[in-house]
């Protein structure tokens, strides 16, 4: 997709994989895409664009969903965070962010606006059974979400503004932190100094595969529908109009 990212660090894929399974690893996944959907008709459009149902959702809650084309094939899979009743923060796969944004723009209707904010957001993924302990060394307790698939939007770490979500792509406990790109190196340094091991995309792939988490371009594609991919639980056929 045109990104220069480490497959592994000096420790190697196996050591990085095991660090996430037993302690804590840190991934730079700033290549992921971020989109804002807002307006009075934001919810209506979410339920139109995505297969999951976003009707009943609290602010600060996150929800996963496939996004499908007219034939039922998967355009992408993504996570939606509810900022407020008329605003949603959407995280999409890096290789698909331009395609996803164009797809959404082509299918949004009514009073709703889309904004691609990918260039102004960096993402670090802190993953593993010790992730909570490490995050507590650098973040305020009130800024740390406790429940899986929830987030805190207005957090600070060493004076840096960030979003902290209790989500991940490894099958382990963990967090994903969103910040300004200029703050990402300092945030990375703070988390590694607190004990997180730098991990590359090689370990990220083995971890997600071991946890049976699909990856677009492999287990997901426009020729594969959510049922074929084992994601039928995220398809809600009856949603409010």
Where are these regions (language model features)?
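Acidic, proline/glycine-enriched N-terminal capping motif
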Residues: 1-68, 73-75, 202
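Conserved, structured C-terminal
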Residues: 1-11, 83-241
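Short, acidic/polar N-cap/turn motifs at the starts of alpha helices
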Residues: 32-34, 64, 77, 121, ...
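Well-ordered mid-protein domain cores that form the structural environment of catalytic cofactors
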Residues: 53-107
């Amino acid at each position: 997709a045109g990104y220069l990212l480490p497959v592994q660090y000096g420790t190697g894929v196996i050591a990085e994989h095991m660090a996430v399974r037993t302690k804590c690893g840190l991934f730079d996944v700033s290549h992921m895409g971020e989109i804002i959907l807002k307006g009075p008709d934001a919810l209506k459009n979410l339920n139109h664009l995505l297969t999951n149902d976003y009707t009943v959702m609290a602010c600060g809650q996150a929800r996963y969903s496939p996004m499908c084309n007219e034939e039922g094939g998967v355009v992408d899979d993504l996570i939606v965070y509810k900022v407020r009743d008329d605003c949603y923060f959407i995280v999409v796969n890096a290789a698909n962010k331009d395609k996803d944004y164009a797809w959404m723009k082509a299918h949004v209707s009514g009073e709703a606006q889309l904004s691609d904010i990918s260039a102004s957001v960096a993402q670090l993924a802190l993953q593993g059974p010790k992730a909570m302990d490490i995050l507590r060394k650098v973040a305020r307790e009130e800024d740390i979400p406790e429940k899986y698939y929830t987030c805190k939007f207005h957090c600070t770490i060493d004076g840096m503004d960030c979003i902290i979500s209790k989500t991940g792509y490894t099958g382990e406990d963990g967090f994903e932190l969103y910040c300004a790109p200029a703050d990402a190196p300092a945030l990375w340094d703070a988390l590694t100094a607190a004990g997180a091991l730098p991990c590359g995309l090689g370990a990220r792939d083995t971890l997600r595969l071991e946890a049976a988490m699909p990856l677009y371009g492999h287990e997901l594609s426009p020729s594969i529908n959510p049922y074929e991919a084992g994601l039928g639980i995220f398809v809600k056929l009856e949603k409010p109009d």
